[in-house]
């Protein structure tokens, strides 16, 4: 496709029309110039291709497809190779269904566990979100189709999402809410970026030039197209000028008229319109180069992939007394409606019309079952509960399948509590009171409270595990698969412990991010708060030993890297996988920083007795924070701790790294600056120190005698 030639031949009306979709899922064709329409579809956990009337909330039916584990589950695998393989599967499905663009993954940070859409997002940590997102996008796009990362940016709640203003300081934005997008843009080059519904610091994301042009294109070098979230356009011409290319859905003609009127009025230039059209033509050209005829949507094979991802993502939160894995021949009873009808996916635009869903009961023949509770209500049903308790008494082990019904969490609204339904909590407590070998298997999209956690010996977190949820659960429970997932989010003990408790979801359509950079484990670990389960936590049916931490150099300067290696050994009796996590703890400096941050991870598979060496590479960005004075990332000189372990609170080995910055952080002294502030800065001390020495000598004093003066500002002297 000769893009510049086509651009020259297009009329202003065709250009304006081209910048809006032709309907709910297709771009606008320019038939006389040979530009075809291409189709896009949700979503991040499986195809939601709609042949009937389109919608963005999963109301109307879509083609039968495979539902894969949600992003919350996939992130818990801490396995980028697995994420890339999943992406390849999704990309192949897109080709087979003649889809040009898959709308996902979502890269928004889990600011609060209450966000109703958290199941669609990877993590509370931007580094993990970026690495997993880049792997998934690379896999999707390896098939010649596009991936559209979303929702750019700071779309961290469903409450008032169309109008809410996410208000935060520059450092918080660049350090927490943008890095995942930056990583994916630079490492995977997604063909699409979706502008979010919400405002960011007073300006709608779909018309935010700082976000869409200054940061995305100029700073990060993005060359793809920007599409609005469905119905996110407020002012079409402002959006084009800001760097937003495609309005979705289309078909009304309002966008075309708005653009043409703005050009006529001089508020939108032809160059700005041409830039948007050029981006869209490049996108269409890119996704129409690959022949789709050879691609086959093998639903059976893809179901096996869904099972594998679920098995590798499940997190064993607790396992006392060796209750798990279940012994062969033990008399087990499965309790809870989720054992028969699992909660395997989230609601809203990610909803997949599953061709096949497995339940735990069908994969555990001969196991007794009692319903225990109903998912369509929260109140205790005495008859159902009593029958379940009686069945538990008669068994060697009781396995309770519990979690959150779909009505508790979905796109479109946020949760108001971390509690599970009353009837489920009551059932778990009642069963645990009579059966010491009680296992809880959880189906939920985000963190929950567990008032019964001290009363049960084992808890297995599946999240929303897709079509293979039931089969994966049984394989994990009986030890056919060894759990290897790690939590990609902290599980707090109670809602009031969460860092955004006082400001989420905000008020009067404004959400102030008052917690700043202290999100998730950055807050909990810095404040040493008691949590239910920490970030990165996850057990195994075997044990692992960490040893021999080495740094390739002890001092690093600007432009240099350091390699960190550690040896991990499987010290148990069965094969297993361990995710080695690397955290960086900064020295005390000019800015308040989290006590430690994840800067590397690697998942290794080990046979009993086997050892492997794991290597990480750290650079300046690994040590840096975002400095508003510089409008860039900055790493202060000093000694950094390099910590390696099994979670953010299970750190096995620590090394020291000396970083030497190319230049000290600029500082501004004013008449209101204290002597302490001046004297603790090397430049200030060099200037003021000799003056104070002369003053002290003239008065017959030493500097110690005037140390009290450091409490006062310079204006006092």
Describe the function of each predicted region.
Residues 620-663:
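Terminal connector regions
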Residues 660-679:
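Low-complexity, Pro/Ser/Thr- and charge-rich linker/hinge segments at domain boundaries
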Residues 1-624, 639-644, 648:
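Glycoside hydrolase catalytic-domain context in secreted enzymes
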Residues 704-717:
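Residue-level detector of conserved catalytic or cofactor/ligand-binding positions
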Residues 673-703, 707:
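Charged/polar low-complexity intrinsically disordered segments, enriched in acidic residues
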């Amino acid at each position: 496709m000769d893009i510049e030639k086509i651009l020259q031949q297009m009329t202003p009306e065709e250009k304006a029309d081209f910048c809006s979709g032709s309907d709910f899922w297709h771009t606008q064709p320019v038939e006389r110039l040979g530009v075809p329409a291409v189709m896009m579809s949700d979503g991040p956990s499986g195809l939601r291709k709609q042949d009937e009337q389109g919608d963005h909330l999963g109301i109307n039916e879509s083609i039968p497809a495979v539902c894969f584990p949600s992003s919350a589950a996939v992130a818990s695998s801490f396995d980028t190779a697995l994420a890339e393989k999943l992406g390849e599967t999704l990309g192949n499905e897109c080709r087979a269904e003649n889809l040009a663009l898959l709308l996902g993954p979502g890269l928004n940070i889990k600011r609060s566990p209450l966000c109703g859409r958290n199941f669609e997002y990877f993590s509370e940590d931007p580094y993990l979100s970026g690495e997993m997102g880049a792997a998934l996008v690379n896999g999707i796009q390896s098939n010649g189709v596009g991936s559209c990362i979303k929702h750019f940016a700071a779309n961290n709640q469903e409450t008032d999402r169309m109008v809410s203003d996410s208000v935060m300081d520059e450092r918080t934005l660049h350090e927490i809410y943008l890095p995942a997008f930056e990583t994916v843009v630079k490492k995977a080059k997604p063909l699409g970026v979706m502008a979010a519904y919400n405002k960011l610091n007073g300006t709608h994301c779909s018309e935010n030039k700082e976000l869409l042009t200054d940061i995305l294109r100029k700073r990060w070098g993005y060359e793809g197209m920007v599409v609005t979230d469905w119905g996110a356009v407020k002012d079409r011409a402002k959006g084009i000028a800001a760097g937003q290319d495609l309005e979705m859905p289309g078909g009304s003609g309002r966008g075309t008229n708005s653009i043409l009127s703005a050009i006529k009025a001089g508020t939108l230039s032809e160059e700005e319109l041409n830039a948007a059209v050029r981006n869209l033509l490049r996108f269409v050209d890119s996704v129409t180069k690959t022949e789709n005829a050879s691609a086959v949507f093998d639903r059976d094979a893809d179901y096996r992939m869904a099972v594998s991802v679920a098995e590798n993502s499940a997190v064993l939160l607790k396992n006392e007394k060796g209750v798990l894995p279940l012994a062969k021949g033990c008399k087990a009873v499965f309790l809870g409606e989720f054992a028969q009808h699992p909660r395997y996916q989230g609601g809203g635009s990610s909803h997949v019309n599953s061709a096949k869903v497995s339940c735990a009961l069908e994969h555990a023949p001969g196991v007794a079952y009692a319903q225990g509770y109903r998912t369509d209500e929260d109140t205790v049903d005495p008859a159902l509960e009593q029958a379940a308790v009686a069945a538990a008494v008669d068994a060697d082990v009781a396995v309770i399948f519990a979690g959150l019904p779909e009505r508790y969490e979905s796109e479109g609204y946020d949760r108001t509590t971390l509690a599970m339904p009353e009837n489920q909590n009551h059932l778990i407590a009642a069963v645990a009171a009579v059966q010491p070998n009680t296992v809880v298997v959880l189906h939920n999209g985000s963190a929950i409270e567990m008032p019964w956690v001290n009363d049960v010996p084992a808890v297995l977190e599946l999240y929303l595990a897709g079509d293979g949820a039931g089969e994966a659960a049984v394989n994990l429970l009986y030890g056919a698969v060894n759990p290897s997932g790690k939590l990609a989010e902290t599980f707090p003990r109670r809602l009031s412990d969460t860092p955004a408790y006082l400001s989420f979801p905000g008020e009067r359509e404004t959400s102030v991010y008052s917690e700043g950079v202290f999100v998730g484990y950055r807050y909990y670990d810095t404040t040493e708060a008691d949590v239910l389960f920490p970030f990165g936590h996850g057990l195994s049916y075997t044990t692992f030993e960490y040893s021999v931490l080495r740094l390739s150099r002890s001092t690093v300067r600007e432009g240099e890297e350091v390699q960190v290696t550690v040896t991990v050994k499987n010290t148990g009796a069965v094969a297993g996988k361990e995710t080695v996590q690397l955290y960086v703890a900064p020295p005390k400096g000019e800015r308040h920083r989290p006590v430690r941050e994840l800067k590397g991870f690697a998942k290794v598979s080990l046979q009993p007795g086997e050892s492997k060496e794991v290597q990480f590479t750290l650079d300046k960005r690994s040590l840096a924070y975002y400095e508003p004075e510089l409008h860039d990332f900055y790493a202060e000189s000093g000694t950094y701790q390099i910590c390696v372990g099994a979670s953010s609170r299970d750190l096995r080995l620590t090394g020291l790294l000396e970083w030497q910055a190319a230049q000290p952080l600029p500082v501004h002294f004013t008449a209101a600056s204290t002597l302490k502030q001046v004297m603790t800065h090397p430049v200030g001390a060099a200037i003021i120190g000799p003056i104070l020495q002369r003053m002290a000598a003239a008065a017959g004093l030493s500097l110690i005698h005037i140390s009290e003066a450091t409490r006062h500002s310079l204006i006092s002297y």
